[in-house]
Amino acid sequence: MELKSFLLRVIAFTLLAALPTVNATPAISLPYPFEADKLYDLKIEQRIGPDSEVRKRANAYRVYLALTPPGWGTGPVCWLAKEVDIDVTQVNITIPADAAPNQSRIRISTAFLKKGAPRSMGFSYSSRTTLVGANATWSQKELDGRSHIDAEEVSCWAFGCARTCQETYYTTKDEEDGPIGTKAYACIKQCAKDLNPRSNGAINGMHMSRILAVAVIIGFIHMVAGVL
């Protein structure tokens, strides 16, 4: 039941990502190239007027990493800053090296939300830039266009670990709804629990090596458990 609820949320998330935004597109300034594991102070202007209807529905925005797996469309895959005050225009962002393959074409995505709400409202995207210094490999699930990692729940510091969960437990498309799918979902949730930042903002770059080490350990533990 928990897995079915999770899959329904992912489907709803995917459909929402495909809808055009009804708000003014934010101005997001990105460096080119964008270095992995480096702390950036990004300028993000939501351009919401003081009397905008948006303010009745939202008082913050979430910042995501958006990827484009080969052969598929672009969409948010993990969050970089969970809650940013709607009028804040400078956001500290670090993209972990294991979040995407090297030389990936990436975007930064934002979405409005009420503080404390688990899910956001619609998505806007920056222009593209290239991620350098990264070391991830596309999982088969991503290449199949069937990733079950929820960008609202999984931070980019837990995303590499969650990708390992998918690689460990999903070997065929027929395994998504049975016991293996349940194990994969539990593994992904554990990654988020252990590696998501405790605060609403981005993690300071000085702690990145420690976080990556923990991600490797968690992924290894689940990999061993999967073959026992």
Give a label for each model feature.
Residues 1-27, 202-228:
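Fungal secretory targeting signals
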Residues 32-40:
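Short, solvent-exposed loop/linker segments at the N-terminal edge
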Residues 74-87:
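Solvent-exposed serine/threonine-rich low-complexity stretches and specific carbohydrate-binding patches
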Residues 89-93:
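Short strand-edge motifs at loop-to-beta-strand transitions and within beta-strands
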Residues 100-120:
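Internal, hydrophobic beta-strand segments that form the core of beta-sheet-rich folds
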Residues 115-128, 174-180, 199:
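Beta-sandwich strand segments
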Residues 118-157:
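Short beta-strand elements
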Residues 172-180, 184, 188-213:
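C-terminal GPI-anchoring signal of eukaryotic secretory precursors
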